Amino acid sequence: MAFKPLHDRVLVKRVQSEEKTKGGLIIPDTAKEKPAEGEVVAVGAGARKDSGELIAPAVAVGDRILFGKWSGTEVTLDGVEMLIMKESDIMGIIS
């Protein structure tokens, strides 16, 4: 299913966290927190200034990003859990 976010919204796929610690301990599902890191899958056209001028998004498809723990709305598209969030919820791009 194709999905195109509107305005300054971004579709993000969470990056899976490691199931083992560096010391080799396996982390059970009940103890895992959802990662606050993801990959941008789709980007809207951008926000608009009061004058109506379009502000281009700072992120692009494929960017790896860091976002707040409670950011976005969870959705399932084609059986994959994703997040839709405003661009302002993104803290930065990981390079």
Curated annotation (Swiss-Prot):
Matching InterPro entries: Chaperonin_GroES, Chaperonin_GroES_sf, Chaprnonin_Cpn10_CS, GroES-like_sf
A GO molecular function held by the record: unfolded protein binding
Highest taxon listed in the record's lineage: Bacteria
Localisation per UniProt entry: Cytoplasm
Any one GO biological process: chaperone cofactor-dependent protein refolding
Record keywords, A-Z: Chaperone, Cytoplasm
Coiled-coil regions, chain positions: none
A Pfam family this chain is assigned to: Cpn10
Signal peptide start and end residues: none
UniProt xrefs under SMART domains: Cpn10
CDD domains assigned: cpn10 (cd00320)
Record GO cellular component, one term: cytoplasm
Function: Together with the chaperonin GroEL, plays an essential role in assisting protein folding. The GroEL-GroES system forms a nano-cage that allows encapsulation of the non-native substrate proteins and provides a physical environment optimized to promote and accelerate protein folding. GroES binds to the apical surface of the GroEL ring, thereby capping the opening of the GroEL channel.
Homology family: Belongs to the GroES chaperonin family.
Subunit composition and interactions: Heptamer of 7 subunits arranged in a ring. Interacts with the chaperonin GroEL.
Protein name: Co-chaperonin GroES
Record organism: Rhodobacter capsulatus
GN (gene name): groES
